[in-house]
């Protein structure tokens, strides 16, 4: 069934299509990216990951990295790179962090800031990495983009967006046109404009010269927030956003067919957002839809609380975003919580990952054993495989303390992510299996790490 009308999710959960496992052959070893490179054993959250389209053995990742706390600093964009398909990693911080007296650090426009947040990165077709985020200290939440060249090997500079023009930003997401068309190489950045003088909401900026200059901000859905973005194989730009009205919101899709110069926006679904903390738990949760696309269509996943627990929902469009399929549930059990879903598409395979509590939840809802699960589709989302456990050990998400301006609330970030290349998927997540190996005053548990694994099919 297809329609542009909004669907109530709770009425559709039973419509999930699940087939036997498709092409999954092996979930590889869980790799602790920061195990031996963070002597302070601090937290890393909100991970992001991308595979180099020129060389699938090269993978880059990022996260909010709290290692500077041990020397009086704060959270900062970590940058991690692998040249052996994710087996081993080099670890660094984006230049400009507090105490960075290198020439790159002193020349970075980030050098005046105390901390950064909301990391998301992507590759273009030429081996350039674009890494976005926001500052999180005076004078406000300022948007920035970092560029790495040489397949992510070389730092090439940082652009800071003037807050007087681009306002206070939140939750940026980034995508690059790799279509080979007239806008190939264009970089698109969506974010929440939270303090605009005019219409607030989902906003887009773009660059057509490799990040040297950027367009003025364009409001594409006033009142929208928590954007996701993808560029399809024909260069069309899709931006998802949610309306206000927590917990009952609507999802909107904004579409550009002219390289991001103009957008049309329409409402596609009703959504019940996750509560700010799941019942019985103290770490925070959000509903943040994520997008992917390939030659078969455009796909969206999100976490929905319409049945009184969190479920991973999926829909697709095969007509350039005009109509969307009835949402289906991806998690193949209804018990427990299933949240922080992420999606990627490559080589005819759709890959989805999420956090899942099916193996470790008390009767009051408290999660004691969290895992990462994976599902795939080889028929453009018409059905999904049996869910597959990715994590080799369960962990407690209510342990690690959030080292954030004196806030000691357990914190798992607001998202995890998956990247894909032909024949493989690469999830990345925040993991507490080694947390609380020791504690520090005020901030409690340490050693919350980034993990990844390679799933081959």
Each language-model region and where it sits:
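C-terminal PAP-associated
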Residues: 23-457
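Bacterial N-terminal signal peptides that target proteins for export
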Residues: 1-9
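Bacterial N-terminal signal peptides
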Residues: 8-17
């Amino acid at each position: 069934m297809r329609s542009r009308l909004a669907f109530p999710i709770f009425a559709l959960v039973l419509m999930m299509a699940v087939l036997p496992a498709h092409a999954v052959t092996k979930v590889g070893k869980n790799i602790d990216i920061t195990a031996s490179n963070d002597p302070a054993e601090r937290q890393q959250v909100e991970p992001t990951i991308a595979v180099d389209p020129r060389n699938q053995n090269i993978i880059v990742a990022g996260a909010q990295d709290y290692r500077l706390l041990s020397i009086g600093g704060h959270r900062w964009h970590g940058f991690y790179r692998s040249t052996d398909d994710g087996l081993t990693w080099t670890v660094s911080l984006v230049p400009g962090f507090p105490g960075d007296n290198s020439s790159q650090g002193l020349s970075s426009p980030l050098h005046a800031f105390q901390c950064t947040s909301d990391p998301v990165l992507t590759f273009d077709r030429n081996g350039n990495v674009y890494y976005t985020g926001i500052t999180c200290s005076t004078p406000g939440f300022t948007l920035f983009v970092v560029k790495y060249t040489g397949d992510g090997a070389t730092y090439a500079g940082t652009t800071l967006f003037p807050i007087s023009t681009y306002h206070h930003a939140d939750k940026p997401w980034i995508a690059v046109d790799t279509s080979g068309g007239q806008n190939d190489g264009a970089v698109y950045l969506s974010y929440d404009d939270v303090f605009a003088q005019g219409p607030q909401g989902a906003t887009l900026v773009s660059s057509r010269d490799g990040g040297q200059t950027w367009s003025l901000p364009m409001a594409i859905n006033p009142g929208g927030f928590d954007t996701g973005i993808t560029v399809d194989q024909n260069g069309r730009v899709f931006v998802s956003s949610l309306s206000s009205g927590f917990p009952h919101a609507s999802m909107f899709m904004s579409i550009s067919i002219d390289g991001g110069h103009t957008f049309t926006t329409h409402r596609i679904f009703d959504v019940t957002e996750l509560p700010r903390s799941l019942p019985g738990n103290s770490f925070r949760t959000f509903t943040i839809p994520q997008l992917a696309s390939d030659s078969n269509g455009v796909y969206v996943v999100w976490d929905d609380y319409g049945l009184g627990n969190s479920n991973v929902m999926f829909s697709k469009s095969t007509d350039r975003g005009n109509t969307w399929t009835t949402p289906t549930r991806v998690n193949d059990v209804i018990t427990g919580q299933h949240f922080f879903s992420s999606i990627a598409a490559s080589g005819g395979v759709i890959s989805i990952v999420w956090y899942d509590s099916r193996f470790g939840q008390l009767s009051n809802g408290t999660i004691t054993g969290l895992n990462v699960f994976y599902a795939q589709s080889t028929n453009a989302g018409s059905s999904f495989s049996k869910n597959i456990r990715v994590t080799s050990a369960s962990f407690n998400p209510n342990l690690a303390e959030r080292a954030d301006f004196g806030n000691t609330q357990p914190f798992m970030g607001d998202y995890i992510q998956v990247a894909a290349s032909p024949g493989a998927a690469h999830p990345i997540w925040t993991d507490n299996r080694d947390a609380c190996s020791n504690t520090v005053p005020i901030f409690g548990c340490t050693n919350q790490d980034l993990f990844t694994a390679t799933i081959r099919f």
